[in-house]
């Protein structure tokens, strides 16, 4: 199985739930986060993925490296948020549900769709919510930020999916 095959399978699963596009969050400036919309049919064709194999599963990820960020930023920016808004939502979710359970993606879902952290963590759907009339999935782990130093934590990673290898046999 190739990175492209895994990305296509992920897109098929998302489209099966009538998913329209992915919302990918990236650091815009030190103080803002931009949300870029990538159509579901285009997303798996992009050269922005890495693959990690385990015994029974395969994981597809996006790294926040310069070239890949440029590709993501070439798609329409549909929203911009002050980083503090996302950090506050993250802190709220981690206080409610535990630090290891709530990430930037969950915080952004909470902001975009006004969904409770309980609902977000319980959901098994490919579709995270509806934004501008489209069914979307949010990926926001590319915005990690060290609040103490005021710097990016390094090339952060957003998991796109983790699938059982049996799906490709």
Stretches found by the model and what they are:
Residues 1-169:
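Nucleic-acid endonuclease domains
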């Amino acid at each position: 199985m190739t990175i492209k095959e895994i990305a296509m399978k992920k897109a098929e699963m998302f489209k099966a739930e009538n998913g329209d596009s992915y919302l990918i969050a990236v650091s815009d400036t030190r103080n803002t986060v931009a949300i870029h919309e990538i159509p579901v049919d285009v997303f798996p064709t992009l050269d922005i993925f890495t693959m990690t194999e385990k015994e029974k599963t395969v994981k597809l990820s996006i790294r926040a490296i310069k070239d890949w960020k440029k590709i993501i930023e070439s798609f329409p920016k549909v929203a911009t948020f002050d980083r503090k808004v996302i950090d506050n939502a993250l802190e709220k979710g981690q206080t409610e549900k535990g630090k290891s359970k709530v990430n930037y993606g969950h915080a952004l879902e909470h902001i975009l769709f006004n969904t409770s952290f309980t609902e977000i963590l319980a959901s098994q759907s490919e579709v995270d919510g509806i934004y501008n009339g489209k069914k979307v999935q949010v990926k926001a782990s590319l915005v990690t930020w060290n609040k103490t130093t005021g710097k990016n934590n390094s090339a952060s990673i957003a998991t796109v999916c983790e699938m059982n290898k049996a799906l490709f046999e």
